[in-house]
């Protein structure tokens, strides 16, 4: 038995200079797992609660000492003596102790940190890599794949202080033979883009996720700059590299007026008009994936969007589904979107995360594993992507060590697994196989 003998919680810093929760789970025999909770900037209203202290005199109210206290107190008391390999049992104990619908008592940041640390400790006890233990928990032992990365090379919206409304413009190295080559292609385009932006007199400062954050005249101009960068790097857009966008449309949706307000370019749209605006972009550029193309509450609009583009474009629900099986089931039943973004901390435990992945795959949805804009050096999502054979990962640009840490872990995993973890490129994207 992988008996838990101690649990330690602490307050550490994330990549935005805000506190977050880190947890250690110690087992008999000297085995240990450590994990940290990430934090989002553009968040869905139905996400599990990230518990903050609210003390304005300390970290501007963003301290997490209450969540840390829960880890070191109630959670530790309940889990010490339990088996770390019994992930579902551990997570359910924490969920039941919290007793709220959205983990508001302890905080999803507390529960998640312990949940992931327990999984890492269990993997250490078993003497296997974390991705292998996750595959076991997922009921798919030995089934792996290397994910196609969505690399966020131009940041806008809530992730940058600029005039670009759409939050993320991403490249996907679909023409690569393996993950390592895909990463190289992405890095080369990233550096090529820096030269393109500089030549046009734009800033090459980076946003929260490591992509550039230039003040561009329109959202389409971001795509145009990437097009030039891809060509200058020696690749063919649409063949070697495809494009993806995260609109994070809830951030520029005016609920009172019921319009989508692209203030950066002075344009306003109804729900239907914005769908056609996005469709026009997919006709002009090889965009194969659009995330959160409408406000999280605009289900009628999403139904229209799915009918309009769902057979050819991957439509990913992030704020729309918030890694929640109840909300995802509603989407599946009503023909809303065709893919889900998976973020641990939206739901707050590894077990619930795996349940969302399974539900999505069983319904024929694709799965994209994702970081948050507030990250740490913790690279657990790399193991999650491989261990669930998710197929796609979104973990920022080729800049900032909080992003690159995940890519480096994927390089190590590919080196270990070789042909046991195929890289399928464009075949992983809904509507493109």
From Swiss-Prot:
Catalysed reactions, as listed in the record: (2R)-2-phosphoglycerate = phosphoenolpyruvate + H2O
Pathway(s) served: Carbohydrate degradation; glycolysis; pyruvate from D-glyceraldehyde 3-phosphate: step 4/5
Localization per Swiss-Prot or TrEMBL: Cytoplasm; Secreted; Cell surface
GO biological process: glycolytic process
UniProt entry keywords in alphabetical sequence: Cytoplasm, Glycolysis, Lyase, Magnesium, Metal-binding, Secreted
GO molecular function, one term: magnesium ion binding
Residue sites binding Mg(2+) per the record: 246, 291, 318
Cofactor binding mode and count: Binds a second Mg(2+) ion via substrate during catalysis.
Cofactor(s) demanded: Mg(2+)
HAMAP family the record matches: Enolase
Similarity remark: Belongs to the enolase family.
Stated name of the protein: Enolase
Lineage of the organism: Bacteria, Pseudomonadati, Pseudomonadota, Gammaproteobacteria, Alteromonadales
Name of the encoding gene: eno
